[in-house]
Amino acid sequence: MTDRSSLTLVLAAGEGTRMRSSRPKVLHEVAGRSLLANVLLAAPAGKQDRLAVVVGPDHQAVADEARKLRPEAQMFVQSERKGTAHAVLAAREAIAGGADDLLVVFGDTPLVTAETFARLQAALTGDVAIVVLGFRAKDPAGYGRLLVQGNELIAIREQADASEAERKVDLCNAGMMAFAGKSALTILERIGNANSKGEYYLTDAIGIAREMGLRAAVIETDEDEVRGINTKAQLAEAETVMQARLRRQAMEAGVTLVAPETVFLSADTTFGRDVVIEPFVVIGPGVSIDDGAVIHSFSHVTQSSIGKKVSIGPYARIRPGTSLGEGVRIGNFVETKAAVLESGVKVNHLSYVGDAHVGTNANIGAGTIMCNYDGFDKHRTEVGAGAFVGSNSSLVAPVKIGAGSYIGSGSVITREVPEDALVVERNEQVTRPGWAKRYRERKAEMKKPKT
């Protein structure tokens, strides 16, 4: 933590053409969150911290995503793409507004952590005007090299301009930078475009700061944290890294992952104590899982609240709007959606529970379907506490099943069932003794060869 004020500037104006997608690059997702969201939620968010996002002229969706997550964020448009420094100066108004520290980060680096933002700020001490985030690359080819003398960064050399000796340097530029607020705008406004592309490069700030008698420094982080996303392949690589991070955090918090590499979590998944997740489970966004819950193999859960000691699966699908109370049992091939199941409810086999409220200790038999859609609108089903719904029943919504009532197997329920009543809605069984034997004999006679 620091008592200095900050302005975090997120550069999110890139086209992302190599993604081969109509969606803006920073809105692609890692662990159930957009690339941009992962960056914004890692950025400083204290009372003294401000946030600005630079977007492209046709990227209203990017601005909307940023405001959804950080409503206080200022938006700036980079009308022409003329380099990284040009993008930063698109937010000149925000920079001029003043802050002790200016933090610049790309919106396509979803693995960056809050700790790294804090370390960048902490390194802005004394006459250090710029701090650059670096990493040791396994293969530095293509990266800008950070050239250091002692504790001072003297230059960022791009691959094409590097000497043979400089190309052997494995300390590379991650793209994330911090500026001392008092000198930031002066340095940025001195960056020119005298290069082959006619663009304004943020990396030129190092030389300008040194010409002003100021120092630049480097802090290092792991290569995985600063992965930039430009292709779908890189998106998949970032997902792999993020999932490994989330699994490790979950296990360190006491969650049992039987086969961690087969479980997929979301960045916002929350766990209680003694949760067990079996192999091949997918947890989508917006899920909380309380103490002692067990999610069995091949289950999918998203935007739902899972209560204490709940058992789910195997092969269950828990869809958005589901709330499962303590001790609820959801068995194999059960699907729930927009449903509240109070404590002790059992839905053990082959059922659909949608747009419903199921009271405490009710039992929903195998093959029960809540028929919630009439082709135009969704309707709700209410099942009272302690009700027993027999196997292969259809509850045609809107309908209310009274507390303590019994529904006979195979029934189609279209009207309200009173409390403690028995309802059986099916044709009376007809038994014809000897019919099957006579039928087989007749069929066998018909199949005999004709002479």
Curated annotation (Swiss-Prot):
One of its GO terms (molecular function) is UDP-N-acetylglucosamine diphosphorylase activity. Its cofactor is Mg(2+). The keyword Acyltransferase applies. Its EC number is 2.7.7.23, 2.3.1.157. The keyword Cytoplasm applies. It catalyses: alpha-D-glucosamine 1-phosphate + acetyl-CoA = N-acetyl-alpha-D-glucosamine 1-phosphate + CoA + H(+); N-acetyl-alpha-D-glucosamine 1-phosphate + UTP + H(+) = UDP-N-acetyl-alpha-D-glucosamine + diphosphate. It is an enzyme of class 2 (transferase). One of its GO terms (cellular component) is membrane. Residues 233-253 are annotated as: Linker. Binds 1 Mg(2+) ion per subunit. InterPro entries: Bifunctional_GlmU, GlmU-like, GlmU_C_LbH, Hexapep, Hexapep_transf_CS, MobA-like_NTP_Trfase, Nucleotide-diphossugar_trans, Trimer_LpxA-like_sf. GO terms for biological process: cell morphogenesis; cell wall organization; lipid A biosynthetic process; peptidoglycan biosynthetic process; regulation of cell shape; UDP-N-acetylglucosamine biosynthetic process. Residues 254-451 are annotated as: N-acetyltransferase. Transmembrane segments: none annotated. Acetyl-CoA binds at A366, N372, Y373, S391, S409, R426. It is found in: Cytoplasm. Its main location: cytoplasm. Pathway: Nucleotide-sugar biosynthesis; UDP-N-acetyl-alpha-D-glucosamine biosynthesis; N-acetyl-alpha-D-glucosamine 1-phosphate from alpha-D-glucosamine 6-phosphate (route II): step 2/2; Nucleotide-sugar biosynthesis; UDP-N-acetyl-alpha-D-glucosamine biosynthesis; UDP-N-acetyl-alpha-D-glucosamine from N-acetyl-alpha-D-glucosamine 1-phosphate: step 1/1; Bacterial outer membrane biogenesis; LPS lipid A biosynthesis. UDP-N-acetyl-alpha-D-glucosamine binds at residues 11-14, 25, 78, 83-84, 144, 158, 173, 230, 319, 337, 352, 363. Mg(2+) binds at D108, N230. PANTHER family: BIFUNCTIONAL PROTEIN GLMU, NUCLEOTIDYL TRANSFERASE. In the N-terminal section; belongs to the N-acetylglucosamine-1-phosphate uridyltransferase family. In the C-terminal section; belongs to the transferase hexapeptide repeat family. Homotrimer. This is Bifunctional protein GlmU. It comes from Afipia carboxidovorans (strain ATCC 49405 / DSM 1227 / KCTC 32145 / OM5). The lineage of its organism: Bacteria, Pseudomonadati, Pseudomonadota, Alphaproteobacteria, Hyphomicrobiales.
